[in-house]
Amino acid sequence: MTIFRRHYHRVLLVLLLCLCSAGVSAQGIAKGADVSWLNQQAASTPPQVFRDAAGNTTDFIKLFKDVGGNAIRLRVWVNPAGGWNDGRDTLDKAKRAAAQGMRIMMDFHYSDSWADPGKQTKPAAWAGHSVTQLNTDVYSHIQGILQYLKDNGITVSWVQVGNEINSGMLWNEGKTPNFATLGQFINSGYNATKAVYPNAKVVVHLANGYDNANFRWFFDNLRSAGGKWDVIGMSHYPPVGSWQDYNNRLETNMRDMITRYGSDVVISEVGMDWQQAATTRAMLTNLLSRSNAIGSRVLGVFYWEPNAYPGWQGYTLGAVNNNGQLTEALQAF
């Protein structure tokens, strides 16, 4: 009887492990979208609404799910004008995403507005703070927002500690090439994330995913400074006429980041001209094929604001028409 029980327990353990593995692999690559503008669009005059192919008004996240989307990315600002992308606005969108079964990525900008390679302006409330204080600011901000989400039933899978930080963050203290301080800021965000969501993966995100030399320079220096990360994030906005070349260069960079640093990678942002939907679909199909060929270290591809009406906020790389219907671009998902 004892031998039988041992054998039974071994078989049961193997079956459970297989089921767990199947559950993980079943999630597959994240086919995502940053939809942070949604509530602001709904509050515009007239409100921007979304329609299915039959012309019926519906929720954009449901439209996205219906074409194969399975993940949502949301940016967070510190004290934004109008409240867009603050904690409450973010929670509302996160709840809508969770209701559709989406995995969620949070994108912390450490600013009251846009942060990108050309500007990394500190939040007004943090101006004049020392490096020690800024580290506390970063930790408290991320820990506070994430705990707020968790307390409201939201599971976060990935957390970006900064947005397109090729030139650093929280200028001037964290501006490159001051990697000693920049590494501290990144680690403060990393530690805050793990304190709330131990299993969430922390992303360090740069623009121009095709630029392998810049990625090597940045992550070599960050590693030397003791910076911590789980995932290297990349933005990818290829020109319509040469997207094949840019996809080639992006793949080369992804493979190198995986090999050089033992890191997962994710395409945090991608987009192309909304009027070139067929070409965008081809580009995305190719990008997903390359990502799947690389393997499980490529975690996902996130289209940036596909919900943007043409020209909304000056952005023309969305994936809906002027009637709020999806173009064919996202059929790649």
Model-flagged regions — what are they?
Residues 1-12:
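Bacterial N-terminal signal peptides that target proteins for export
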Residues 27, 59-68, 92-103, 147-154, ...:
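Acidic (Asp/Glu)-rich catalytic clusters
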Residues 43-49, 256-262, 274-333:
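Aromatic-rich peripheral "rim/lid" segments of glycoside hydrolase catalytic domains that contact
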Residues 27-103, 109-138, 144, 160:
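N-terminal substrate-binding region of glycoside hydrolase catalytic domains
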